[in-house]
């Protein structure tokens, strides 16, 4: 999983971009976490608790995206994916949701969060 962090020097906004199949992680980092060090630290602390066996799983529901953590992986997905479709699609049709959902290993997420934390801290 590759990623890149940028900061707009004019607006002060932070932007995370992740590799294909993990694009939604960039949106989650940029929009749901943003530069809030306390929120980033909270997720890092929860990951440590899960790794230590003190907790089985955890969920953080954001404005547009939700983070689910368990002992093995992290799942980030658009809140809209949790809703049932009101209509059925034809057999040959399907909804494209690859940019609305991503999975990664818990350690991979932890590494990316630590990098994001450092990046945000240096930008202050």
Curated annotation (Swiss-Prot):
Superkingdom of source: Bacteria
Disulfide pairings: none
Phylogenetic classification of the source organism: Bacteria, Pseudomonadati, Pseudomonadota, Gammaproteobacteria, Alteromonadales
Name of protein: UPF0231 protein Shewana3_0655
Family: Belongs to the UPF0231 family.
